[in-house]
């Protein structure tokens, strides 16, 4: 009987701890693509973190290496946060885009995502636009080599 009481107490304490200190569940990241002539837009929704950065990495690298898309634009309007592993995935995508002579651009960066890229001195490395229209109408440089748009975004 004493063991049952201890087990109940332990279970109760564990549940209380989990309720107080658990990380809130966030919606999963979603990725989809759209096509405008030779331009592929990758729509990303949700945070890009250590837990899901392999998903965006797989999607982007598949488009660049396997499908050889000439122009890839990543829609980040619905990405509130990017951690260091997400940044690493974007940097790898940029490198692969350059290797395969594809254009790689970002648009719609949240303030948080933009700050991360600024702090890491990567904002000027990427081709960055504020809107989809700007990204679609921009000259078609290869893989972020034209830095003129990154300063205005």
Task: Annotate each predicted stretch with a short phrase.
Residues 10-43, 152:
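Short beta-strand/loop segment at the start of cytosolic alpha/beta domains
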Residues 47-126:
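Amphipathic alpha-helical interaction surfaces in cytosolic regulatory modules
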């Amino acid at each position: 009987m004493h063991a049952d009481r201890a087990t109940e107490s332990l279970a109760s304490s564990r549940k209380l701890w989990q309720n107080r200190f658990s990380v809130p569940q966030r919606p999963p990241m979603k990725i989809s693509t759209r096509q405008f002539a030779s331009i592929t837009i990758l729509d990303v929704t949700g945070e890009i973190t250590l837990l899901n950065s392999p998903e965006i990495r797989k999607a982007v690298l598949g488009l660049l290496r396997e499908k050889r898309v000439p122009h890839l634009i990543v829609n980040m309007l619905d990405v509130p946060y990017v951690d260091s592993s997400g940044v690493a995935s974007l940097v790898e995508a940029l490198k692969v885009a350059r290797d395969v002579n594809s254009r790689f651009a970002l648009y719609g960066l949240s303030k948080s995502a933009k700050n991360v890229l600024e702090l890491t001195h990567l904002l000027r490395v990427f081709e960055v636009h504020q809107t989809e229209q700007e990204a679609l109408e921009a000259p078609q440089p290869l893989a972020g080599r034209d830095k003129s748009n990154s300063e205005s975004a």
